[in-house]
Structures are given as C-alpha cells and as structure tokens.
Amino acid sequence: MAKQRSTPDSSKVPPRPSTARSKPAAGRRPPSRTAANRRRQQRRLAIIGSGVAVVVIAVLVIVGVTSGSGSGSGSSQLTPVSAAELAQVTSVPTSTLVAAAGAAPGGTVSPPTNLPATTPTLTSASKPEIVYMGAEYCPYCAAERWPLVMALSKFGTFHNLSSTKSSSTDVNPNTPTFSFYGSSYTSPYLTFTPVELENRLGKPLQKPTAAQNQLINTYDAPPYTQGSGGSIPFVDLGGKFLISGTEYDGSALSNKSFTSAVGYMTSASNPTSRAAEAVAGHLIGTICSLTNDQPASVCSTVPASLKTGQAAAANQGSSSGG
C-alpha cells in the first residue's frame, strides 16, 4: 500500500530533504491544494524559538474556549471522549484484530517497517518506549490514531482522551479522530509518548524534546523511509520498528461525526474498519515482540508472523508531489 503522509512546518526544524506526499490507496492523487495550504503542509516538525511559550499559552486558551463553545468547522475543537465511546473502540477483541491482520488483502495495509538490528533500543522508565509524533490538522495522523488506540489499549489504559477532527481545508477534510494532546497512558509493559505538534488550525501545541527531534530527523528520512521522508504520522516502536505515514486508507472517514466514526470503525463491516483493525493487529504483534510477549493473555493469541515488521525494502509506496 502506498503510504499517506502530511508534512509539518519547515521553519521549526533544522533543514531536511524536501518532502513528497505518497499517493493514497489505489493510486489516487490527493486533490490540488491552495498555495497557502501547500505551504502549510510543507512546514517542518520542531517548534523552536524564545516566543514558543507565549504561543503555546495562547493556543491553550483558544483550545479551551473553542472546545466549550460549539464552534464551527474552523475551530480547534477538542471534546472529551465519553467512557462508552472509548470502551467501544478499545473493546474490539484481540482475536478480531489479529484475524483481520491475517486476512487483510495484499496492498490494503502497510505494517510497521523493521529498523536495522544495530538501531539503539528506545526505552523509558526501564520499559520499551513508543514515540508518536503527529498533528491534529493532519488527516493521515487522524486515520492512524484509531488503530493505535485499539492496539495500545491491549497493553495499558488511556486517560483523558479527547476527540477532534483534521483540518477542514486539507485532503480528507474533517476526519474525526482522537487527540493525544492532554492525555496520558499507563502500562506495566511499555511507555507511550505522544507528541501532537500542532492543532487543527496549524498552531503549535507541543514542543518535541531534543531526543525526539533527533529520532524524527534520523529515522523519518532515507534510507529508513521511502522518498524524501519528513512526514507525519511518525511512530518509533522501541527503536525496532518504524511507521512513517498512515498504514491504511482512512479517506472514508472524512466529514463524519466522531460518534458516527466510532460505530463505523468498530463494525468490521466496511473496508476502512477492516483495514484499521488489520493495522491494529499488526501493531499488537510488533508490540508483543517489544514486551517479550507480555501480557500473555494478549500475546499468546498472536502468531509469530505478526511479531515482525516488513523489510525496509518492502516499503515501496510510490511518491508524488503534492
């Protein structure tokens, strides 16, 4: 499957190779974007500068106001996810996700890529660490969060998740999704560290650490990624596996409400939900390889074939200018 990627702000990270968005599933090119939106999509990743604290505070105020105001599609709206909605997503059985991964037609999903054996392991608090970097405006990040929540919930518990939607002016506009901003995750088996770089309006949210910047500058680029790299979503799984770009086509989610999307993505009755569940199954397998097959209640149901990623050479998504 050709990976789908968004590219953040170039003014906020040391120079990296120019980016190119991969074609979406079935070889469809994204619709043409306005010049202003294209410039925003080409912006880079890190948020630097002495004025960042002031900007972030301003953004937090904006988010707090709009999340309670019921503003229209142009607002940066965060809404707490209800316990019932979260339970519906996280309670999809492991066996269902694993079976979906095994049954997924070729080309519909793209499993994590293996990093070289010499890559330093990524740990935090003496546990394997998974680092996610994305942005709320990014439609491909929006799609990727669904299987991430499904898979990670088998190893731990999310707290204070919010719902949001991707930019209204990007491809796949208003894709409903979770936001990891302001959330936390607890697990005895692994550490999950999410960084939401910008909100759906493209305003800064979280500043990556120097170590996180080094990760994405090193591994979100050739030879580890197809094309010129520099894309989000970016996920480093324990220094062993890599995701750069979404792993399936989530375009059918565009303009759905979050509540509608919860039902749609857990129904296993449409190609999008089946693909997302397959991605979650692959994620569970690779995470089990990081946690030494713990917990056994989860990992004992996962075949060995899902506990390895795909070879880097298999990451052959055709790239095109966007």
What are these model-predicted stretches?
Residues 2-129, 143, 153-322:
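Non-globular targeting/processing and membrane-anchoring segments
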